[in-house]
A protein has these predicted regions:
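Signature of N-terminal electron-transfer/Fe-S-associated modules in redox systems
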Residues: 1-156
Length: 156
């Protein structure tokens, strides 16, 4: 997208959500939905539209795990890193994913199909270990189960 179109999207989102500090997170969330990540230019445009500092926008965007500030793969895998998931085998699940996708945590596959990230709590502690693939939760993971899940995404 070029800057003019991006700026129009920011204006449209500000019209929808408002131009107050409280509108910042909903606007950033919607930008991620539309563009899959927040560019530096997006954050500057939002700051101008809401009349707040770019540093405030950047600080907010980088604080929240789900507000990506760099391009990600088509499928973003977020593995929960809470103590509940860790105690239930998160490290084994992570190793399995890294082995299958041939990437390390924080990386994206060369074909840009998958990104592998950790997230703080994703809300499934009672069914740990858990992960999200984009917005789809997968729980009570085992190496076998995660292998099966990834095979389905690889086929897509």
């Amino acid at each position: 997208m070029d800057t003019i179109i991006e700026n129009e999207l920011v204006k449209e989102l500000a019209n929808t959500h408002g131009r107050t500090r409280e509108s910042l997170i909903p606007i950033l969330q919607d930008l991620v939905v539309h563009k899959r990540f927040l560019s530096k230019q997006d954050m500057i445009d939002v700051a101008r539209e809401l009349d707040i500092s770019a540093a405030d926008v950047f600080g907010t965007a980088t604080f929240y795990t789900f507000l990506d500030t760099e391009p990600r793969g088509k499928y973003v895998i977020r593995i929960c890193k809470t103590i509940s998931c860790a105690m239930k085998g998160k490290n084994e699940i992570l190793s399995t994913i890294e082995e299958i996708l041939k990437v390390n945590l924080g990386e994206t596959t060369p074909d840009r199909k998958f990104s592998l990230l950790e997230a703080n709590c994703i809300g499934w502690c009672h069914k740990a270990p858990a992960m999200l693939v984009n917005d789809t939760p997968y729980t009570e993971l085992t190496p076998e189960k995660v292998t099966e899940i990834l095979r389905e995404y690889i086929k897509k």
